[in-house]
Amino acid sequence: MSLRYLRFLTAGESHGKGLTAILEGIPANLPLSEEEINHELRRRQRGYGRGGRMKIEKDTAEILSGVRFGKTLGSPIALFIRNRDWENWKEKMAIEGEPSPSVVPFTRPRPGHADLSGGIKYNQRDLRNILERASARETAARVAVGAVCKKFLSEFGIKIGSFVVSIGQKEVEELKDKSYFANPEKLLSYHEKAEDSELRIPFPEKDEEFKTYIDEVKEKGESLGGVFEVFALNVPPGLGSHIQWDRRIDGRIAQAMMSIQAIKGVEIGLGFEAARRFGSQVHDEIGWSEGKGYFRHSNNLGGTEGGITNGMPIVVRVAMKPIPTLKNPLRSVDIETKEEMKAGKERTDIVAVPAASVVGEAMLAIVLADALLEKLGGDFMEEVKKRFEDYVNHVKSF
């Protein structure tokens, strides 16, 4: 992902020793603890319809560098998440030596996965060399990085949340009226209620109804996708820019969301619905008051105009395709024999939309932390906060 101020990388295979992330650019003197990161990792592991892997992994992050006595140093922050399942995969995922006769190559690519495309690109006859890195297990490292960025944003009053809008063909009917996009209190309430739901639905009383639907789909050997919503509150106007294509904040957010495994669509504000409305029904009228300053009477555009944040809540809906590993595999071809046969199988989830919403929070936090630091600069928190205060005063006086 292209960032302008922050830099981060992740490394690690799904069944390797663990996942590593390095984040550079966070200012010095930000209070940070491992527990704050681990809280986000626990949220990612929740959700009805998850696979057996979640019973094995209890993700915790270890801070290896960049923090001393509970505060960031301004140097790169290195994080490590150990894979507990590694103990069961030492032979299959050995770093050195030759594979033993018991290690069977994965040669039947799964439709919808990176298996075949990646095998061709990197000339790998054992497709496990592709699927291990392509796995959504990698998102645990991104959630850890996002937790640091969330903590940074919280120092400026910026809050990020999410909830599930639909799973498969089953929608949360109450979320079809999108007038709440302009209501920070309603958005935050939905997020808080989703925290009490196994499916991250902002109406936990609907959990059993949705779980029954998931169980019925599972019995058919199918998997499910869905739509989740992620939002940010108290984001100041002026992040991003209209000046060049790659500086537009909505483009940066969309790219970040599309980089999440299995994501196939992103809407900001009304998204595709805006294309079916008249202009007068889409564009958010502007108001001003002594206490609030400039505001919009609605938030159909999801908090951005011209590639720049406008001070309204940032609201993003993200579409996740069904998980491609199926109990009843689809047709494929063995890359060694070229014979048509059923695709290979791996342990997998039935639905992972609730977990993906937490990953979406992390990616939004990374993009906004990067954009805020791009706007303000600064090497230590006290300096950044002073610049933020000056900018807020500028906004109020404009």
UniProtKB/Swiss-Prot annotation:
Keyword Lyase: yes
Protein's UniProt keywords contain Amino-acid biosynthesis: yes
Binding site for FMN: R133, A134, S135, Q261, A262, G306, K321, P322, I323, P324, T325, R347
Family matches, as InterPro entries: Chorismate_synth (IPR000453), Chorismate_synth_AroC_sf (IPR035904), Chorismate_synthase_CS (IPR020541)
Molecular functions per Gene Ontology: chorismate synthase activity; FMN binding
Residue numbers binding NADP(+): R44, R50
Domain of life, source organism: Bacteria
Cofactor mode of binding and number, as noted: Reduced FMN (FMNH(2)).
PROSITE patterns with a match to the protein in the record: CHORISMATE_SYNTHASE_1 (PS00787), CHORISMATE_SYNTHASE_2 (PS00788)
Annotated keywords: Amino-acid biosynthesis, Aromatic amino acid biosynthesis, FAD, Flavoprotein, FMN, Lyase, NADP
Residue ranges of coiled coil: none
Cofactor(s) this protein cannot do without: FMNH2
GO biological process assignments: amino acid biosynthetic process; aromatic amino acid family biosynthetic process; chorismate biosynthetic process
Assembly with partners or alone: Homotetramer.
Described function: This reaction introduces a second double bond into the aromatic ring system.
Family membership: Belongs to the chorismate synthase family.
Annotated protein name in UniProt: Chorismate synthase
Species per Swiss-Prot/TrEMBL record: Aquifex aeolicus (strain VF5)
Lineage, highest ranks first: Bacteria, Pseudomonadati, Aquificota, Aquificia, Aquificales
